[in-house]
Amino acid sequence: RLKEEVDANLVSLLKFPALEATNLVKHAFSTRMGGVSTGYLSSMNLSFTKENSYDNVLENYKRVSKALGVDVEDMVLSYQTHTTNVLKVESKHRGSGILRKREYGDVDALITNEKGVCLVTFFADCVPIYLLDTKNKAIGLAHSGWRGTVERISEKTFAAMQSNYGSRAEDMIACVGPSICADWYEGAVEVADKFR
């Protein structure tokens, strides 16, 4: 189960007790609460590609970073296109997607073992996958839509952690974040057939 924390600005963050108990990683799943965006994007819009001002979105990131206890400068945003591409994030990527242009594209999963780097991915109805290697102190975060799920993005993210950091299954904690449920998901038969 997820635990909700709400700060003084009413920023609502959902956290996994299993990850918190390790004291190895700061993590969260943001909600739509506590931001400054207006209209149909209110209030915690974190997408620079939607119809909202850059200043509002940047302020939302500042609020999330404060509530989480990280710096905006340390955040690295994915560039999601429903692929299974995994980016090994290094210090040189800090601020990418927020404070400066990303030098990468088509990335739906991020991994790192660099302390202080904050991985950021985006979700609406897709599935967030959080990975923590408790021995090698590496993390992964994957955006798993139906295509990524069929094409095994979680497995590919773990494989990237294995090859880059020596991660082993017995040292991993994996958490599945909030996503759409079967009651609300509408999909075509040809999509459902891909899961068989």
Feature-to-residue mapping (PLM):
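Active-site microenvironment for binding and transforming phosphate-containing groups
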Residues: 1-196
